[in-house]
Amino acid sequence: MTQWRIDTPQSLDLEGVRRLNVRIVAGSIDVVGSTEATSTGGAHIEVSQLEGALTVTLEGDTLTIAHERLTWGGLLDWVGNMGNHKASAVVSVSVPDGCPVELGVVSADAVVSGITADTKVKSVSGSVTLDGVNADISAQTVSGDLETRHLEGQLRFTTVSGDLTVVDGSSSRVKAETVSGDITLDLDVAPGARLDLNSVSGDVTLRLPESASLQIEAKTMSGSLDSAFAGVTRDAKPGRSTLRGNVGSGDGLLQAKTVSGDVTILRRDSA
């Protein structure tokens, strides 16, 4: 194991990196997948702003960049003690695009792009953007928003009040759960896809191509339900409304449930 203590802005080049773990407080983190150093596992770290030391560790093929004493399981503990921890960082990291990423942020914004391996995200209050991540994603936030662009893979997302936005995505499996956050998906769905979308008071909006093939089951207690697809009908009763029907041959499944949030299913016409 090799370890460096970073207490001033600087850059660092490493080789043999096949996995990345990042945990920072405040500031921002930008992770970019590169195809240029795949064979050597080359990684480049650029720290441009810093308050509170960072520890950089290369153990085997795992690169870890973290504020001192900040653990993956202890992210929430920092929220109540932010005044006692003077820490922030602006960091950019380039790693091989096939490098799995585990990212934890507290009051920091994060961007991950060009990664083709599984990506795991935990955010307390920072916003997270995943661009061109062509692999499975697992994301958990408290109040942070998650936006994905050009998603190709399965997505699992849980939050209290953060919003989920998927733009220009393609997936066979999406599972999203929120309390008050909104869920907005613009998605191509693979044959046999399964989408499970649950919210208490947040709205669920889904735009599907007209060629989609899904069985639709949407329920709400007091929100509104609406679908742009023929063959999907609404049944409204006191305290419960449902939206059911098939789009195409119905070989996939969309289940959406809310308490007071609205559910809207839009159709994207062919060009």
Language model features with spans:
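Intrinsically disordered, low-complexity terminal regions
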Residues: 1-271
